[in-house]
């Protein structure tokens, strides 16, 4: 999956480009690093989603730059069930904690 990063640290957007060359703009929900997997992860949601719509969050691992940020490098699909379970647990913690999710 190819990606292009636009914006600054407060308003990061990523354009995902699928195998057919279709582009879709996503907002960065948050990023984190897992010491267990020694990888950085980014969670994204579609930029065009309305406030009252359910959103589908997508997660990828990525190669962080020197400051730990998402770069324009390729995103990597998460392939193992254990890794998906870890990412889902982090997302659930984020969504359940009002201080983190901004509820």
Swiss-Prot record:
This is UPF0473 protein LBA0420. HAMAP family: UPF0473. Disulfide bonds: none annotated. Pfam families: DUF1292. InterPro entries: UPF0473 (IPR009711). NCBIfam families: PRK13678.1-4 (NF010217). Belongs to the UPF0473 family.
């Amino acid at each position: 999956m190819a990606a292009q990063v636009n914006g600054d640290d407060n308003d990061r957007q990523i354009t995902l480009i699928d195998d057919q060359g279709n582009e879709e703009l996503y907002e960065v929900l948050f990023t984190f690093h897992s010491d267990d997997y020694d990888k950085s992860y980014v969670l994204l949601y579609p930029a065009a989603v309305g406030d009252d719509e359910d959103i589908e969050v997508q997660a990828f691992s990525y190669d962080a730059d020197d400051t730990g940020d998402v770069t324009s490098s390729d995103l990597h699909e998460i392939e193992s069930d254990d890794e998906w379970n870890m990412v889902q647990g982090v997302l659930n913690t984020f969504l359940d904690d009002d201080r983190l999710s901004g509820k």
